[in-house]
Each structure stands twice: as structure tokens, then as C-alpha cells.
């Protein structure tokens, strides 16, 4: 199967990933310029397996059956894996994206395989990207919405996990409590992919990393500034900063900082420069990416008005992007409330890459599933 893939990618090359061998956390004096894409050959795929819309919570406990950093059964958090594995998955995402963009439809590694998609929280992007991606690679995905499955209420999570494992080859779940995804993975005998929890959103950040590589040329050594609530998106950026060295800044109002334990863990990894600040104007200077998310996530709508008041001064507008500098891109995990956390002008500006970013959800997730299923 991998050999067939290698023959396909020879006619559909994509940007190569750039990760320097330096272990330094920051690269002063390095100027990264904005460009639309890098046209360099990528390595053939290896033969062996390899918010948005959620509120922030405290760090959850870890699953009890953690294996090696490269051969984990599940994809629950980016920093569960080592740097080499994350690089391999991103390489794979780039290759498979190029293959699909070329019109090639004969690479079907998921043929005969099925996936259950559990949605305690609805999401257009998560459902369409997973379902379409799995289909394009030959598989069949089943949607299980809130009315179809209620883990921990109508049926215990451990029972759901063991039943679905007997029907499916892989499970994706988008849930509220992070403990739900940990329990699902612990009792499932097939791989489980974290489609989002209140604690983190690893698939989104993998897509974001792929998007940065395509437009900037690399993740390593860049400056990413997140402006807004220190929520699950920030937690997953911190996960990425634990395995790839770059400069990450979270600019948020006082009282809305990310989980302290999560921040501490990322700093202890010793790879990236990490800052938490309450001054967005100072934070964005020299940024390669300015990133935003909704101020009131799903399950927080009763706090929306209070949050709007608390987040005054944290809107990403044209003036803030000007402070960031000419090389800065704007990214947003979507859905966006235009006129609230970001202006319409910023979303529609030439430096906005929110829609390539949204597309890359599918390609990053395809690569994650290929890795977990041994392709």
C-alpha cells in the first residue's frame, strides 16, 4: 500500500516541511517572509505505521495505558507523541493533500474500513472534514449525534467504547469533558481520535501547523500570537510548543489565562519560548501569525455579554495587524463572529489564510488516521 502511495506522489508533489535540527527555542535575527507556497519535493510516505467552540478547564488526568511516544494507539494530544512522529504525520498530510489535489483517486488505504464519529457537540467543519476525508481514502464514516449516543448518560462510556470497537476500525469523538475522551480511548480496542474536548483541540492545531508550513515554509522559529480567551485552542498550541520549537504568545484579559499546569508543562519541555500577557498590542509586534477564536464558546453563551465587556481591546482589527507587521498572517479556527473577536476586513484581507486553514483540517486528519491505522 505504501509502495502504491509512493508511485502516486511522484506526480503530485507538495511543499516540504522545514524543521531545523537546532534545539534552540528561539531564533533572533531570522526574518521569515510571507509567500504563498513552497515548491519543493517531499519524502515518500513511510512504509510502516506511524474552540473551536469549547471552554477552558483544568488539566485532565492521563490515560492509564500510555505506550511509547511513537506507537500510541490513539491521537488525544499532540505532546503525547515525539517530535519525529509529529513531523512524520505532517509530512504525510502534505503528501496526501498533493495526491488528492492532483485528482488521483486510486489510493484507497481505508477501503473496507469504517469509522464511528461521536458528536456530543455539533460541528460543520469537524464532521465534513472527517467524513469526506475518510471517504476519499476509501472508507465509510458513520455519524452519531447527541440523539444517537449519550455517553455516560444513556450508556456508560466503557460500554460504548467496547461495542463500537467491535463494529469499527477507528473512532472519532467530539465531546465536552476531556475525561470522556480518555475513558473512550482506555476501553476501546481500536484507535480513538480526539475531535475536540473542553481541554484541547489537537486536530485543529495539526491543520494549523500544516497551513503555516505551506505559507511561511516552517513552524520552527516562527512567532505565533494568540489573541483572546486562553481556552482549549491555546492548550493545543502549548502542546505543539512542547514538541516543536517556536515562540508562542497568548494575549488574553486578566482572569482568562490558559491552565497554569498546561503552561508549566510546555515551559518545562524547554523547546519553545512561551509568554502569557495581557497586552495584545505589545504581543503582536513581529508576529508571523496572529491567531484568534470566539470569545464565548459552545456552553458559554450565557456569558457572552460579560465576555464581550471583559475582552474589549482584544479584537483583531486592521490596526492590530498593522502593528504585527507586513509578514504577519491572520488565522482563525472558525466559526468566527465577525465584528466581535475579529473584524470583517481582517477575515477578508489578503493576509488572512483562514480558508486554506479550514481545508487543511481534512488533510491533517487524514494523515493522523493513516498513522494510527498503520499506513
Curated annotation (Swiss-Prot):
- Going by the record, the broad EC class of this enzyme is transferase
Pfam families documented for this protein: OTCace (PF00185), OTCace_N (PF02729)
Enzyme Commission no: 2.1.3.3
Q: Transit peptide boundaries, per UniProt?
A: 1-53
Chain residues that bind carbamoyl phosphate: 123-126, 174, 201, 204, 333-334, 361
Kindly list the GO CC terms recorded for this protein.
Answer: chloroplast; chloroplast stroma
List where the protein spans the membrane.
Answer: none
Per its UniProt record, what Gene3D superfamilies does this chain match? Aspartate/ornithine carbamoyltransferase
Subcellular location field = Plastid, Chloroplast
Q: What is this protein called?
A: Ornithine transcarbamylase, chloroplastic
Organism annotation = Arabidopsis thaliana (Mouse-ear cress)
Amino acid at each position: 500500500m505504501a509502495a502504491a502511495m509512493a508511485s502516486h506522489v511522484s506526480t503530485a508533489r507538495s511543499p516540504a516541511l522545514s524543521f531545523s535540527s537546532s534545539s534552540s527555542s528561539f531564533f533572533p535575527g531570522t526574518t521569515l517572509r510571507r509567500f504563498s507556497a513552497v515548491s519543493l519535493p517531499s519524502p515518500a510516505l513511510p512504509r510502516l505505521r506511524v474552540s473551536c467552540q469549547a471552554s477552558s478547564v483544568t488539566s485532565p488526568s492521563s490515560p492509564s495505558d500510555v505506550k511509547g511516544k511513537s506507537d500510541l494507539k490513539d491521537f488525544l494530544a499532540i505532546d503525547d507523541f515525539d517530535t519525529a512522529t509529529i513531523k512524520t504525520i505532517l509530512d504525510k498530510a502534505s503528501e496526501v493533500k498533493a495526491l488528492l489535489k492532483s485528482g488521483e483517486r486510486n489510493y484507497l488505504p481505508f477501503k473496507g474500513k469504517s469509522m464511528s464519529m461521536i458528536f456530543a457537540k455539533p460541528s460543520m467543519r469537524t464532521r465534513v472534514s472527517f467524513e469526506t476525508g475518510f471517504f476519499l481514502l476509501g472508507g465509510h464514516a458513520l455519524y452519531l449525534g447527541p440523539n444517537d449516543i449519550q455517553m455516560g448518560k444513556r450508556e456508560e462510556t466503557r460500554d460504548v467504547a467496547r461495542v463500537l470497537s467491535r463494529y469499527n476500525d477507528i473512532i472519532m469523538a467530539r465531546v465536552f469533558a476531556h475525561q470522556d475522551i480518555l475513558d473512550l480511548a482506555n476501553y476501546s480496542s481500536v484507535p480513538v481520535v480526539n475531535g475536540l474536548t473542553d481541554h484541547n483541540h489537537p486536530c485543529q492545531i495539526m491543520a494549523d501547523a500544516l497551513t503555516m508550513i505551506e505559507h511561511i515554509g516552517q513552524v520552527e522559529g516562527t512567532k505565533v500570537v494568540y489573541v483572546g480567551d486562553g481556552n482549549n485552542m491555546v492548550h493545543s498550541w502549548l502542546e505543539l510548543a512542547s514538541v516543536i520549537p517556536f515562540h508562542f504568545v497568548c494575549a488574553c484579559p486578566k482572569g482568562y489565562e490558559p491552565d497554569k499546569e498546561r503552561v508549566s508543562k510546555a515551559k518545562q519541555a524547554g523547546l519553545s519560548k512561551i509568554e502569557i500577557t495581557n497586552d495584545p498590542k505589545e504581543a503582536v509586534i513581529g508576529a508571523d501569525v496572529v491567531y484568534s477564536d470566539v470569545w464565548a464558546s459552545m456552553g458559554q453563551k450565557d456569558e457572552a455579554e460579560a465576555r464581550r465587556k471583559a475582552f474589549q481591546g482584544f479584537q483583531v482589527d486592521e490596526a492590530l495587524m498593522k502593528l504585527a507587521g507586513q509578514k504577519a498572517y491572520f488565522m482563525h479556527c472558525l466559526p468566527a463572529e465577525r465584528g466581535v473577536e475579529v473584524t470583517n476586513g481582517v477575515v477578508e484581507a489578503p493576509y488572512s489564510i483562514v480558508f486554506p486553514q479550514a481545508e487543511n483540517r481534512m488533510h491533517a486528519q487524514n494523515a493522523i488516521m493513516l498513522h494510527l491505522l498503520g499506513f
